[in-house]
Amino acid sequence: MLDKGYIEQILNSKNEVLESIGLKVKSGVYNRNKQKKYDEIVGFCEHLFKVIFNEVGKKRFVFLECSCGKSYLSFVINSILSSFSENLIPYFYGIDKNRNVIEKCVKIKSVLGYSNMEFIEGNTINYTPPRHVDAVLALHACDTATDEAIAKGIEIGAKFIIVVPCCQNQIRPQLKSGHPLTALTDFGLLRYR
């Protein structure tokens, strides 16, 4: 089982990956500005591997990361899984509306020599992956993007849908005084997540 300590141990040996995606600086030191992101990714991976680890080695496991942004998550998962066996080659689709981040992901993929990753500019809800997807992922996808990831996972029949929502900018303004859910937003962290 991959616990947090083991995941971090693997990542400590992956300087090239972590530097390429900006979680470490060239000296091998963790980027303090990205420490929170690193911790979120490690935590997400710990939960992800608890759920999928026994399934991953059975066949070519396909991931779809929705609203992938800079795709830290897919790059980290790819590097962790590739450390177990040369025969264990997952496949990743990353989709995001932002052309700039998709272009950066394509460059990083090329630098790292990852031929098992594709990055697509577009909307999650309109995208149909060319292969069957085993796991749909979303980490801090904003507004309705988490909902779209869940809907896409159901639509394409993914066995696993693992998401961590972000801020709900469209819902928060609707929780006005007198709304039955207003009490949920008394605590700032809940109000903005």
Locations of the language-model features?
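Class I S-adenosyl-L-methionine
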Residues: 1-36, 42-46, 62-66, 86, ...
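Generic structural signal for well-ordered alpha-helical scaffold segments
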Residues: 45-53, 78
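Short helix-loop-beta connector
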Residues: 52-62
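Conserved SAM-binding loop of SAM-dependent methyltransferases across substrates and taxa
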Residues: 70-87
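Conserved SAM-binding motif I beta-strand of class I
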Residues: 91-96
